[in-house]
Regions:
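Conserved strand-turn element in the central/C-terminal portion of the radical SAM core barrel
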Residues: 3-24, 43-49, 56-64
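Short amphipathic alpha-helical segment that frequently serves as the phosphate-/nucleotide-binding helix
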Residues: 25-26, 71
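Short amphipathic alpha-helices and their capping/turn segments at secondary-structure boundaries
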Residues: 1, 26-36
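Auxiliary Fe-S-binding modules of radical SAM enzymes
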Residues: 33-151
């Protein structure tokens, strides 16, 4: 920051697994708020074959998040992000969507998109909808910086 050199940060959603999902989101946001990146690129955790993480999952030490649960983590992360002039991008949403925008200006729109995606998969009480109750996602670009999702 002192040198005036902007930098990009890559974060990994899902890294805390089910047990630490909320803590991971809040602590990641806290770190990002302190370091003031110019761009945040969110990726989804990928478990590679033969890695120590795969072994931890096999032993039940880590329970990975599914793609819909990662949306809960991303929502909590965005709710706790308080950065200025920072571009946020997640190209891994539900393995097929991109949520992106400038912070803080685009924060509400990105949260709205995530809320709409969550509503397709979860009931208001947080329970998962049955597959035949889940909505379909269609795309419509509202601006050059990111898609909107319509139900």
């Amino acid at each position: 920051d002192e040198a005036g050199i902007g930098y990009y940060v890559t974060i990994i959603l899902g890294l805390g697994g089910k047990n630490y999902r909320n803590l991971h989101a809040i602590e990641t946001a806290r770190l990002l708020n302190r370091i003031h990146p110019r761009c945040i690129w969110a990726l989804k955790l990928k478990v590679w074959e033969g890695t120590p993480l795969e072994k931890m999952i096999e032993r039940g030490e880590v329970v990975p998040l599914d793609k819909e649960e990662i949306l809960f983590e991303e929502r909590l992360l965005l709710q706790n992000l308080h950065v200025e002039d920072c571009f946020f991008m997640d190209t891994t949403v539900l393995d097929r969507l991109t949520v992106q925008g400038w912070l803080p200006e685009g924060k509400d729109q990105m949260l709205s998109i995530i809320e709409r995606l969550l509503a397709l998969h979860f009931n208001p009480d947080g329970s998962r909808k049955k597959p035949d109750e889940q909505g379909q996602v269609s795309f419509k670009f509202l601006s050059p910086i990111g898609p909107s999702v319509n139900q």
